[in-house]
Amino acid sequence: MTATTTTAAGGGKVQPRGLPVALSLLLLLVLAAGLGGGAEAQQTCAGQLRGLAPCLRYSVPPLPGQVPPAPGPECCSALGAVSRDCACGTFSIINSLPAKCALPPVSCQ
C-alpha cells in the first residue's frame, strides 16, 4: 500500500497523516466489527480486531525511500487469530463507506 493524495468530494485534497491514519483505521475496524451479525459474533470479531493493535505500526506506509518494517511475531499471531468471516465482513463494510459518505471509491493497486 502506498501513500497517495486523493481528492475529496468537495474538491479538497485528503492527505495521509501517518499514525493518526492508522489509528483511525484501527478504530474503524473495531467499529465495523459491531455492525453486523449476532451479538456474540460481533463481540468475537470486535475482540479479534482489537487484538490487531500490535500490527498498527506495520499498517502505516513508510516515508518515501524507507523500507516498511517486517511484521513482528505478535502482529502475525494476532492476524492469524482473525477469522475469515470477521476480516471479510470488515473489509466489505470499509469498502462501502465512501459511497455512504458521498465520496469516490477507494482504488488500491
From Swiss-Prot:
Disulfide bonds join 45-86, 55-75, 76-101, 88-108. Keywords: Disulfide bond, Secreted, Signal. The keyword Thylakoid does not apply. It is found in: Secreted. SMART domains: AAI. One of its GO terms (cellular component) is extracellular region. Tapetum of anthers. Residues 1-41 form the signal peptide. InterPro entries: Bifun_inhib/LTP/seed_sf, Bifunc_inhib/LTP/seed_store. It holds the Pfam family LTP_2. Transmembrane segments: none annotated. The keyword Signal applies. Belongs to the A9/FIL1 family. This is Anther-specific protein MZm3-3. It comes from Zea mays.
